Amino acid sequence: MKRKLDANDVPSAEVAEGKEAKDADNTDFENLNLDPRLRQALIKEQFTKPTPVQSKAIPLALEGKDILARAKTGSGKTAAYVLPILQTILQKKAADPSLKATTGLILVPTRELAEQVQSVITKFTAFCGKDVRSVNLTQKVSDAVQRTMLADYPDLIVSTPARVIANLGSSALALDNLTHLVIDEADLVLSYGYDEDINALAKAIPRGVQTFLMSATLTSEVDTLKGLFCRNPVVLKLEDKEDEGAGISQFVVRCAEDEKFLLTYVIFKLQLIKGKVIIFVGDIDRCYRVKLFLEQFGIKSCVLNSELPINSRIHVVQEFNKGVYDIIIAADEQEVMGARTTFKKSKEITDGDEEETRDKMGSSEDEDNEPEDNDKKSAHPEKRRKTSGKGKDYGISRGIDFQNVACVLNFDLPTTSKSYTHRIGRTGRAGKAGMALSFVVPADEFGKHKPTSFPTAKYDESVLAKIVKRQAKLDHEVKPYHFEMKQVDAFRYRMTDALRSVTRLAIQEARAREIRQELVKSEKLKRHFEENPEELKQLRHDGELRAARIQPHLKHIPDYLMPSKGRKGISSENVGYVGFTKQSDNRIRKAREKNRGKGKGRKPSGVRKVDPLKTFNRGRK
């Protein structure tokens, strides 16, 4: 059932894209001939003008063409495929109101992205909800409930490939009437370990399905999907000035392993970075080590990892985007634990053909799918790889639409330049400036401080060389950032005290405690919060875990430690004068005096005061 793409057809598709591109700037939502109900929803959501990917993709999609689009996260890719699918469904329902069939399938690599896509569909169907039904199969419900949801033949399904195959196997889902297939973040779907599911799905879907492949990068994995599902697709490569690091100031700091914590403390306590920050770390333990460390100094932060319930993860991202939280500590587990292994490429494609394909499609991979020295991999990452299946459908460095992120802090450097590009893509979006700061451990410093050591830091220097090379090709510079270490060293003893409190046992307790707390918030209260949405705002995810020994004095910075510039930055000019004596009367003391005047609290008259020392009688022997 595999539908291989004829190599001769690819250039003609790209020519078609060039023709469409001429009129793209003049396109408006009014000119796209969308259903009035969809246009009304767009107005409600304040969509005024289509983005480049929308203006190019929607007309082509309405003509029934397969589309392979390269556009960055946050460029409007979701609306580019959701709107034409909804338009087609509404047209079919207008012709036959009794029609009940699943005609659209949207595949995504992670649960977070599935929830995000479902949210967009809900907004666009605000005025046609009775005519269009959509279901998110990644929700944490029983198989019986999911079977009931599918029994009514929803028009549109959002899911990971694994959930689709599971429901196909149990006959709960039928794809006989499928007309639209979308694979969002296509380059990740295969590298997240869904290769077997994708192959099974290619055999299950009917011929002639219109396919959308959406990705931030066009890699060999996307080429594999194109061969499986597409028929002479139109290739849209949207070269945006903001793409892949433009507008982002990139800095790197060479430091020892324990100095990562020292510099992080100084950055946040002295407020060297203004705005929202995402801290990327290697695994879940590192998440809680950094969180507990920052707690010692009264710095609040949220943790985001695959152990937390999906509802909690989604709520954290939503509240972060609203500005409720300023710091998120995210575990980029898929990247570090090796779950992003490359898809087994077809043996029919030779190395030369593959390289030619990458050049054609603008691959962002720089021959660095694995950490350096594959034959010298440490045993530690291999052990972690066993647990990677648990977070298979979790991913935070790609796909999720973080908004107004001022800085990405690579606390642990990723193992590939591709992952680095995806991480820094969380900032500097929508024309705004952003900053990426990465900590790099020199080879001679690796392993010197075992409590804070992380296995992948062994490859930091070689990975950095690839990152610099990759960014140079894109005309971006990775600059060294130098801290004034004489001033920073003044904080070292405080960092050492705090780090000593964050033991392995404290980290385990913190993990267990937060999971218990989030499970209560996520599961038991889910329905309550659906009925009372205002109370959901009261839920906080940045509370202190208090698993480590708290030292209150660390929350205060003495003036003698503060550099003169930093003292001005932190101290507020508007703080009023606070005297040594209290000017206003004490409320309780005032009440006592009033009561005494009324006779309350007085001792009965005639009772003489007794001096216990004068009335003390020595007992007889």
UniProtKB/Swiss-Prot annotation:
Localization of this protein: Nucleus, Nucleolus
Reaction(s) this enzyme catalyzes, per UniProt: ATP + H2O = ADP + phosphate + H(+)
Predominant place of localization: nucleus
UniProt entry keywords in alphabetical sequence: ATP-binding, Helicase, Hydrolase, Nucleotide-binding, Nucleus, Ribosome biogenesis, RNA-binding, rRNA processing
Ranges of compositional bias, category Basic residues: 589-606
Biased composition (Basic and acidic residues): 16-25
Sequence motif Q motif, location on chain: 27-55
Amino acid composition bias (Acidic residues), ranges on this chain: 364-373
Chain positions covered by the region annotation Disordered: 1-30, 342-393, 581-621
Highest taxon of the lineage: Eukaryota
Binding site for ATP: 71-78
GO terms of molecular function: ATP binding; ATP hydrolysis activity; DNA helicase activity; DNA/RNA helicase activity; RNA binding; RNA helicase activity
Keyword presence, rRNA processing: yes
GO terms of biological process kind: maturation of LSU-rRNA from tricistronic rRNA transcript (SSU-rRNA, 5.8S rRNA, LSU-rRNA)
E.C. number(s) listed in UniProt: 3.6.4.13
Domain (Helicase C-terminal): residue spans on this chain: 247-489
Residues covered by the Helicase ATP-binding domain: 58-236
Extent of motif DEAD box: 184-187
S-S pairs: none
A cellular component term, taken from the record's GO annotations: nucleolus
UniProt key word Mitochondrion: no
Family stated for the protein in its record: Belongs to the DEAD box helicase family. DDX56/DBP9 subfamily.
Entry domain remark: The Q motif is unique to and characteristic of the DEAD box family of RNA helicases and controls ATP binding and hydrolysis.
Job description of the protein: ATP-binding RNA helicase involved in the biogenesis of 60S ribosomal subunits and is required for the normal formation of 25S and 5.8S rRNAs.
Name used for this protein in its record: ATP-dependent RNA helicase dbp9
Species of provenance: Aspergillus clavatus (strain ATCC 1007 / CBS 513.65 / DSM 816 / NCTC 3887 / NRRL 1 / QM 1276 / 107)
